[in-house]
């Protein structure tokens, strides 16, 4: 890995509003931990983004310095893709805003949100969208992988309810992707994982659900003859 000079770090820090962590910092080891505790990778630095502009600056810095880049949303990926050794870890976990538009039944969600964060904000208005089954899963990773859960049989997969996305591409451009704008990119995001850029905002369609939901297991008698 290329050694970063103090001047390079100071230049980046001048344009970055979030927090920058190095291995010697107190918060470093806590922030690099993810859901799968078996992952023990150590980035050269961690940048904790607080806005889309922070993400743009982080991607551009990583490109300029030829750093391996990993992106953390909810940090729930079992393979530990959120963390890299000796590179730049871009941490989005502080970007957790959810905004619900009751008139259009749409929600905009930042990439640090978990399913629990999204559900809590939407259910305050009796609304929901198909997500996963574990409240600690990240919205970003679930959505970019396709996403299915308890509501999928009625309302489809998570990506069927994704209306648009704000994306920072690998070359540092900020694009809006939807069915009518950058449609090829939008098609790729809907199930293509994190291969096409860093999504900094998702827009979802919401549906009336609850507040009371009856759930349970249905057990069918076996149709096979006994032994």
Name these PLM-found stretches.
Residues 1-148, 153-154, 161, 196, ...:
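N-terminal accessory segments
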Residues 22, 128, 165-166, 170-227:
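C-terminal cap/substrate-recognition region of VAO/PCMH-type FAD-linked oxidoreductases
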